[in-house]
Amino acid sequence: MAASGSATAGGHWFSALALGVTLLKCLLIPTYHSTDFEVHRNWLAITHSLPISQWYYEATSEWTLDYPPFFAWFEYALSHIAKYFDQEMLNIHNLNYYSSRTLLFQRFSVILTDALFVYAVHECCKCIDGKRTGKDLTEKPKFILSVLLLWNFGLLIVDHIHFQYNGFLSGLLLLSIARLFQKRHIEGALLFAVLLHLKHIYLYVAPAYGVYLLRSYCFTASKPDGSVRWSSFSVVRVTSLGLIVFLVSALSLGPFLALNQLPQVFSRLFPFKRGLCHAYWAPNFWALYNALDKVLSVIGLKLKLLDPSQIPRASMTSGLVQQFQHTVLPSVSPLATLICTLIAILPSVFCLWFKPQGPRGFLRCLVLCALSSFMFGWHVHEKAILLAILPMSLLSVEKAGDATVFLILATTGHYSLFPLLFTAPELPIKILLMLLFTVYSISSLKTLFRKEKPLFNWMETVYLLGLGPLEVCCEFLLPFTSWKLKYPFIPLLLTSVYCAVGITYAWTRLYASVLTGSLVSKTKKH
């Protein structure tokens, strides 16, 4: 009876958290939406009005279909519900079409598909180590994790204000992770394969999946020292995984292969002509690289080491542009970013293979793959930081060191999303939601690990507190100075570079913990 009552109570608090955040999402329906709103409306129109043979060729709008086929079919399914709201939104020639019914349909399509994310969070909570439990419900790791995921600030503003479907996609990722924790490897692999054909950004974490499944599922045993026992290789298991990948890929890409359109599909999915950085530099290594190039350019001009006529005008005046031309440092090619990304990922993958630490080792590798790709990838969007923040939430409630990395990563990464919402009415909303989430995250994790050393040292504390003055400077001071006209890019530049420092630090610290953890494990066994 006691166990039954406890389970019921547990179900009640989780349902209350999910219902509460759903109501908040409904309140955000009238807020600002970005051009992504028109992007997805146009995709509804394309998939509804045209035969499949024209989906990846249609270019009436500049917002062409550039997601994998499963997402196109997802839009197709939504379009058959959308027609009951407003048929005009499905007209390809109605560019930038907007109506109150279109707004309601698209907003609620995001809210309702978030049900998958809610279910995935519930499943992830079952995978949390229950050794560290508090007396009160609010001190329990499962409760804290539920809040960190369900009420994630980044998902709220990116999906339910800016407008995207990251919750639904992140739900598939988290559910796949949960299935691997539960040793339901085939289900986990299937979910991830489907996810790859919904949004190809998840290719970034595919190495973690591939190595983990091969090492921990296809090889059924290890030697006493932890190394792989080659004789334990299971042909049946590797064949089953191969069949999953093949069948899902065939279902997704098969129709376009039959139409001889695969090159066209891939050209839409991987548009390398876009340039190294997005219009607003994602806070990664290349933001620091670009900023250093600007500093060196200014110094070179002051010392008359550079010829002003030879400096690309866009790089020194308009600031944050897509096709960034370097002045002093070497320009970066897509191949260079790919090589840097692979080099950054390899150590974590090697640790996963040679010193496997179960599902948690896989999860650390996944986060490092996501972060490494964010740090060094080509044309990275700032929103891609959520790919690392959400899985890192699972680790944050189990170890103090991981909690520190999560708090620095989440606080810095979430703040870097502020430029997405640049309209005045949304300013108090984003500041309030960010403060609430950040204060809760820090206070709850500090309480959870109160018996251990402080989560932050003085340097980390000063850095995080520095986000306050940065926001005041960018939002309330610089816009009222003469710099606004002369250097309009300065607020974005400061935000990008400052946040890049924090994210780089979090990535470095997490990597150090993984590498030193492997060394400690090896020492203990010897």
From Swiss-Prot:
It is a multi-pass membrane protein. InterPro entries: Glyco_trans_ALG6/ALG8. One of its GO terms (cellular component) is endoplasmic reticulum membrane. Its EC number is 2.4.1.265. The chain crosses the membrane at residues 9-29, 108-128, 143-163, 188-208, 238-258, 334-354, 361-380, 400-422, 427-449, 461-481, 487-507. It is found in: Endoplasmic reticulum membrane. Keywords: Endoplasmic reticulum, Glycosyltransferase, Membrane, Transferase, Transmembrane, Transmembrane helix. One of its GO terms (molecular function) is dolichyl pyrophosphate Glc1Man9GlcNAc2 alpha-1,3-glucosyltransferase activity. Pathway: Protein modification; protein glycosylation. It is an enzyme of class 2 (transferase). It catalyses: an alpha-D-Glc-(1->3)-alpha-D-Man-(1->2)-alpha-D-Man-(1->2)-alpha-D-Man-(1->3)-[alpha-D-Man-(1->2)-alpha-D-Man-(1->3)-[alpha-D-Man-(1->2)-alpha-D-Man-(1->6)]-alpha-D-Man-(1->6)]-beta-D-Man-(1->4)-beta-D-GlcNAc-(1->4)-alpha-D-GlcNAc-diphospho-di-trans,poly-cis-dolichol + a di-trans,poly-cis-dolichyl beta-D-glucosyl phosphate = an alpha-D-Glc-(1->3)-alpha-D-Glc-(1->3)-alpha-D-Man-(1->2)-alpha-D-Man-(1->2)-alpha-D-Man-(1->3)-[alpha-D-Man-(1->2)-alpha-D-Man-(1->3)-[alpha-D-Man-(1->2)-alpha-D-Man-(1->6)]-alpha-D-Man-(1->6)]-beta-D-Man-(1->4)-beta-D-GlcNAc-(1->4)-alpha-D-GlcNAc-diphospho-di-trans,poly-cis-dolichol + a di-trans,poly-cis-dolichyl phosphate + H(+). Disulfide bonds: none annotated. One of its GO terms (biological process) is dolichol-linked oligosaccharide biosynthetic process. Dolichyl pyrophosphate Glc1Man9GlcNAc2 alpha-1,3-glucosyltransferase that operates in the biosynthetic pathway of dolichol-linked oligosaccharides, the glycan precursors employed in protein asparagine (N)-glycosylation. The assembly of dolichol-linked oligosaccharides begins on the cytosolic side of the endoplasmic reticulum membrane and finishes in its lumen. The sequential addition of sugars to dolichol pyrophosphate produces dolichol-linked oligosaccharides containing fourteen sugars, including two GlcNAcs, nine mannoses and three glucoses. PANTHER family: DOLICHYL GLYCOSYLTRANSFERASE (PTHR12413), DOLICHYL PYROPHOSPHATE GLC1MAN9GLCNAC2 ALPHA-1,3-GLUCOSYLTRANSFERASE-RELATED (PTHR12413:SF2). Belongs to the ALG6/ALG8 glucosyltransferase family. This is Dolichyl pyrophosphate Glc1Man9GlcNAc2 alpha-1,3-glucosyltransferase. It comes from Mus musculus (Mouse). The lineage of its organism: Eukaryota, Metazoa, Chordata, Craniata, Vertebrata. The gene is Alg8.
